[in-house]
Amino acid sequence: MYTKSVELHKEALEHIVGGVNSPSRSYKAVGGGSPVAMEKANGAYFWDVDGNQYIDYLAAYGPIITGHAHPHITEAIKTAAENGVLYGTPTKHEVTFAKMLKEAIPSLDKVRFVNSGTEAVMTTIRVARAYTGRTKIIKFAGCYHGHSDLVLVAAGSGPSTLGTPDSAGVPKSIANEVITVPFNDIESYKAALDKWGSEIAAVLVEPIVGNFGIVEPEEGFLEQVNELTHKAGALVIYDEVITAFRFMYGGAQDLLQVKPDLTALGKIIGGGLPIGAYGGKKEIMEQVAPLGPAYQAGTMAGNPASILSGIACLEVLKEEGVYERLDELGARLEQGILAHAETHGITITVNRLKGALTVYFTDEKIVNYEQAENTDGEAFAKFFKLMLERGINLAPSKYEAWFITTAHTEEDIDATLQAVEDAFRHMKK
């Protein structure tokens, strides 16, 4: 079934570190083996190098909300290719796109384009430090903010201790600038501010978590974080790399009616091409060069290909009924998964928000990383492989979301549920 994928992975191991260009693409978290190599994609479907077809819920870890090879986005990319994909000069298209982002996300007074979500987050931290004159940041356990040194930090031994490096090559001195606290735990957040408040430049928040599954903030949590942070003289940064344009046209901040000082964007806003952006209050953003002392630059930043692709993607998402449709399909999928789990005696919890969900193998409602970490990884690994064999492509990690796209249909959801039912039946044997 996967002969060519296995052969390709063996060859890749000779030339590419670990055989993959991002560790999340390996199957290490689901028991190992050769990852399936895809050859083409269209709409909600993948075809691998062996010719097997899959219904895709990976969606490239979130960006492909309109489905693969969407005609409107494809035409935009063709236009860019025909007119030059990289200028190194200003263009009218980047102004158009900046205006679209500002109209969609009201907290953005000014915007700057970069090349990835990692870059966007990294720069918001630099800007916050420049604006406040402070150096420390607070982040929440389990929330992934890219692979820059400052955010590759794990929790220390207590809720208000300094962090420890979460990767080789991250100096302890950098980790000492980060305090990690549990998500949805306002008392731990207060304790961190009581201890370090005068040194905190910013708190970095996923307003809706996407990196240990889909986890919503408890009622009042984000509002209290905003209030306490500002009282301490620090800034609030929202990492909306996953959430922006995922749950509604705009950001999670608009859905939840909370506003940060700075926002990092990525994934969906590129329409499938590499991009990042950050923005926020005018007086804070004017810290950025050439207006201010906080330096940030990029050869590829604002390139016409990514910008035109992003504009086209947002034009599709702005169409009436898009998010209602994603919510309907998400509800159909969630209800079916839960029904089949009950029928076959499989213990799961599903966290869903509109067109994104996570299936946890536990009976506990997941509200923080510690709970997600304690879910049954072996059960998920078995489920993942059974689903793959049945033509359903999921992320190879118990922490990741299933992403529904505008290309998915009721028939796709029903075919997926048939695979779920069969997988659960086999898991009970």
UniProtKB/Swiss-Prot annotation:
The gene is hemL1. This is Glutamate-1-semialdehyde 2,1-aminomutase 1. One of its GO terms (molecular function) is transaminase activity. Pfam families: Aminotran_3 (PF00202). GO terms for cellular component: cytoplasm. Its main location: cytoplasm. Its EC number is 5.4.3.8. Its cofactor is pyridoxal 5'-phosphate. It comes from Bacillus velezensis (strain DSM 23117 / BGSC 10A6 / LMG 26770 / FZB42). It is an enzyme of class 5 (isomerase). Belongs to the class-III pyridoxal-phosphate-dependent aminotransferase family. HemL subfamily.
